[in-house]
Structures are given as structure tokens and as C-alpha cells.
Amino acid sequence: MIALIAAVSAGGIAGTLLRFATTNWVAAHWPRHFYAGTLAVNLVGCLLIGLLYGLFLHKPLAPVELRAGLIVGFLGGLTTFSSFSLDTVRLMESGQVPLALGYTSISVVGGLLATWAGLSLTRF
């Protein structure tokens, strides 16, 4: 159990640091498009969860520490629904309602498509 907790913790730290770096880099380079960093990590996370889920379906003997460390830890730290929600509210409050609706649509539909694409990549 300690190895499992350590794997999830290490994955969470890595995913969180990558999200922090990505969103800060985007905000520094494109301050008007602050939401793009959250969108990027969420879409990449969706692609990766589909890919990892598909790989682990074909390799069910992969250690539980590896599966949990990557999916629960790393991807849980990388992706974020709360930041997505805050970004959407900020866009709406600044009067950018069409952009907020587009961002929400791209996030949800893009996330579903990215997850499907990741899973599909394991089926060839």
C-alpha cells in the first residue's frame, strides 16, 4: 500500500508541476489567452487517459502502482476541472460570452474526442 501511495503522490507532483509550468508559460506569452494553458493540459490529459486506458486493457498485468501513478496521480494532477470552470467564468464576466461558450464547447467535445483518439491508438 505504501508503494501505491508513493506512486500516486509522485505522479501527482509531476502532473501538477507540468500543469503549473504550462499555464504560467501560456499566461506569460499570451496574457489575453490565459485559458489556453488549461485547455491544452486538459486536452492532452484526455488523449493520454484514453491511450493509457487502452494500453492497460491490453496489458492487464501492468503493476497497479504504474497504472494508478499515471492515471490517478499524473493525469489527476495535470488536468483540472476547477481551473476550466474559473477560466470560463472569467471570460463571461469580462463580457467575452461567445469566447466562453466556444472554450466550453471545445473543452468538452475536444476532451471526448481526445480520449476516444487515445483509446483508438491502442486498437491497431
Swiss-Prot record:
Protease found in the keyword field: no
Q: According to the UniProt entry, how is activity regulated?
A: Na(+) is not transported, but it plays an essential structural role and its presence is essential for fluoride channel function.
Entry's transmembrane regions: 1-21, 37-57, 69-89, 99-119
Which reaction(s) are listed as its catalytic activity? fluoride(in) = fluoride(out)
Q: Does the keyword Metal-binding apply?
A: yes
Alphabetically, the GO molecular function entries are: fluoride channel activity; metal ion binding
What Gene Ontology cellular-component terms does the record carry?
plasma membrane
Q: Can you tell me which residues bind Na(+)?
A: G76, T79
Q: Where in the cell is it found?
A: Cell inner membrane
This protein's major location comes to membrane
Keywords associated with the record: Cell inner membrane, Cell membrane, Ion channel, Ion transport, Membrane, Metal-binding, Sodium, Transmembrane, Transmembrane helix, Transport
Its BP terms in the Gene Ontology are: cellular detoxification of fluoride
Query: What is its membrane topology?
Result: Multi-pass membrane protein
- Sorted alphabetically, which PANTHER family does this protein's record hold? FLUORIDE EXPORT PROTEIN 1-RELATED
Task performed by this protein: Fluoride-specific ion channel. Important for reducing fluoride concentration in the cell, thus reducing its toxicity.
Family membership? Belongs to the fluoride channel Fluc/FEX (TC 1.A.43) family.
NCBIfam families given for it? crcB, PRK14234.1
Protein name (record): Fluoride-specific ion channel FluC
Q: What's the source species' lineage?
A: Bacteria, Pseudomonadati, Pseudomonadota, Gammaproteobacteria, Pseudomonadales
Gene name tied to this protein: fluC
